[in-house]
Each structure stands twice: as structure tokens, then as C-alpha cells.
């Protein structure tokens, strides 16, 4: 018996095709039903039940908002009690990483604006009251990441500049608000539909924290489309971006990058090379930390 065969909807499905894209630990399947619907099935170990229940409930809450994303259908236990499944509607379209550069720069920018507005809506869900103070929480994360980097045996060029920025800008973490976070918000988790509209996918890394921390993943978008990434920032802030945002974005990007080689070691030489090259590029964006605004950022499309 396959792990999804005891799901109550199984007899309505005419095809089940595994999807191998992305870094998620979930198994993902594209399902076609007898009544010509496309669905996304996610399966993981039953030990993740409470997390998947919470993810499903949050997506149901987000479904009330105005942006394009998968609709939550059902979740439950399958595979003889060994797994938990989540069933969602499927968003038809292309991976934004592959499609963006086929669009005009203006369209890329406009889709970026939409992505920023979507993220602002996502951040409308508040964090639980009992959550740890952000300054304390993130300072621990910085300490842990620097420590892991120093122990990993790999050396990033200009690592002193990265660590120095982190150490000198910890005060930016004071009094930061917290909210629901998508957890991995970048073009790798976005779909461009066949009508050239934007869809958001893969909420499985959701968390709670400073809303601006979400921009730590912007590097994956900026590498492919500076126009999209500029629009993303401007759309989020409705074209009124505070100076402090750029300083904090660099703090969060720096925190990510100092730990990226230690993370990449688990995945082999190819990922290590990606991490090293990406960090080298980011340092150039910021003129070797002489600027806290990346060189690709445009206040508008005329810049």
C-alpha cells in the first residue's frame, strides 16, 4: 500500500505524480481528480501533526485575504497512522525563477510590488502573546550562527566585515514587533500563472518574528531580478521605505550569510560553491559594507 492510499479522497484521484522541487522535507504530489481538479498533497511524518495542523489553520485564515495562494481543503492522518497529510488546491503556472526574465522589466517590477503587498497582508496575522522578546531571541540566533561559522572550518571572504556589522548593529533589534511569517518568502516559492499573475506557495516553514526579517531571503530574488526585488520592497512599504529598514535588512541578510557555508556543508561541494559565490556577490551589492542600501535597489522604475 502506498502512503496515500488510505486517504478518504483516494478513490476520486485519477493520477498522483510526485513533485521533487524545493527544499521541503514534506513529500509533495500533484493530483488530478475525476472531476478535473488539480490538487497539491503534502505528506510528512506523523510526529509533525501539531505543526501541520497549525499550518493548515493559518492557511485557512490567509485564504480569507485577497491574494492568490493554495486553498486549504483538508488534513489528517494516513499511511496506517504513520504520516500526516495536507490537501490543498493546486496553483497552475510556472516557477517564478524560470519565468520572470521572460517578462518586461516593468512587469517584473509590478509583480514585485504585488509580492510586497501580499507579504504585508500575511504579516497581518499577529504573533502569540507568550512569544519570547525578539531582541533576546535574535541575539541568541546571531551568537549561534557566528559560533557555528567559526567551527565549520570554512572561510568566507570578508567575513570580518559581516561579523563586524552584526556585532555593531544589534541595537537595531530593540523593540521590534512580531507577527506571523511565511518563513521562506522569495521567488523560489512563487508561481507566475498563465495570466502572468503572482501566486504564493510553500508556507511549511512558517514562524513568528520581526516582519522585516522576511526580507533576509530577498537575495534569492535579487540575483535574478533587481526590478522584482525593488518592487517587492516598495510595494511592502507603499513607496515610503524607512531608512532603518535597509539597516535591519542588511543585519538579517548578514546573519543568514554567516551561517550559509556551515549549512551548505551538509549538501556537498555544489551548495558550498553557491553559498560562497552568493556571499561574495552580496558584499559587492553593499560596497564591502560601506553602504547599507544594496546597489540594485531602485526607488522607482525610472531610477
What are these language model-derived features?
Residues 1-11, 113, 121-183, 234, ...:
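An alpha-helical support segment within catalytic cores of ATP-dependent transferases
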Residues 59, 104-105, 199, 216-218, ...:
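Glycine-rich, phosphate-binding/catalytic loops in enzymes
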Residues 27-32, 164-215:
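Active-site acidic catalytic loop and adjacent metal/ATP-binding pocket
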Residues 17-133:
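ATP-binding pocket architecture of kinase catalytic cores
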Residues 52-55, 212, 230:
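Conserved strand-to-helix beginnings and helix N-cap segments that scaffold or border functional pockets
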Residues 63, 73, 100, 204, ...:
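Short, flexible helix/strand-to-coil boundary loops that buttress conserved ligand/catalytic motifs
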Residues 28, 41, 72, 89, ...:
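Generic structural signal for small/hydrophobic residues in well-ordered secondary structure
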Residues 113, 174, 217, 224-303:
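Helix-rich C-terminal or lid/interface subdomains of diverse kinases
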Amino acid at each position: 500500500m502506498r502512503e496515500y492510499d488510505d486517504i478518504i479522497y483516494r478513490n476520486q484521484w485519477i493520477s498522483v505524480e510526485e513533485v521533487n522541487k524545493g527544499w521541503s522535507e514534506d513529500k509533495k504530489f500533484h493530483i488530478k481528480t475525476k472531476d478535473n481538479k488539480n490538487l497539491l498533497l503534502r505528506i510528512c511524518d506523523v510526529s509533525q501533526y501539531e505543526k501541520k495542523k497549525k499550518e493548515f489553520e493559518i492557511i485557512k485564515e490567509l485564504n480569507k485575504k485577497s491574494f492568490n495562494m493554495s486553498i486549504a481543503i483538508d488534513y489528517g492522518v494516513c499511511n496506517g497512522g504513520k504520516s500526516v497529510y495536507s490537501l490543498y488546491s493546486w496553483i497552475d503556472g510556472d516557477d517564478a525563477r524560470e519565468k520572470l526574465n521572460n517578462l518586461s522589466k516593468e512587469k517584473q517590477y509590478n509583480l514585485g510590488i504585488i509580492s510586497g503587498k501580499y507579504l504585508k497582508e500575511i504579516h497581518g496575522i499577529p504573533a502569540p502573546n507568550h512569544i519570547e522578546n525578539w531582541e533576546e531571541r535574535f541575539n541568541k540566533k546571531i551568537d549561534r550562527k557566528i559560533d557555528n561559522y567559526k567551527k565549520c572550518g570554512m572561510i568566507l571572504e570578508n567575513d570580518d566585515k559581516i561579523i563586524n556589522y552584526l556585532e555593531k548593529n544589534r541595537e537595531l533589534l530593540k523593540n521590534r514587533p512580531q507577527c506571523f511569517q511565511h518563513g521562506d518568502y522569495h521567488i523560489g516559492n512563487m508561481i507566475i500563472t498563465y495570466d502572468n499573475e503572482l501566486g504564493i506557495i510553500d508556507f511549511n516553514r512558517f514562524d513568528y518574528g520581526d516582519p522585516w526579517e522576511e526580507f533576509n531571503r530577498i537575495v534569492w530574488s535579487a540575483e535574478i531580478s533587481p526590478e522584482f526585488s525593488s518592487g517587492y520592497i516598495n510595494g511592502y512599504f507603499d513607496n515610503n521605505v524607512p531608512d532603518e529598514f535597509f539597516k535591519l535588512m542588511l543585519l538579517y541578510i548578514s546573519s543568514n550569510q554567516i551561517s550559509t557555508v556551515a549549512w551548505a556543508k551538509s549538501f556537498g561541494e555544489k551548495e558550498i560553491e553557491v553559498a560562497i559565490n552568493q556571499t561574495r556577490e552580496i558584499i559587492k551589492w553593499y560596497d564591502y559594507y560601506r553602504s547599507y542600501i544594496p546597489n540594485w535597489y531602485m526607488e522607482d522604475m525610472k531610477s
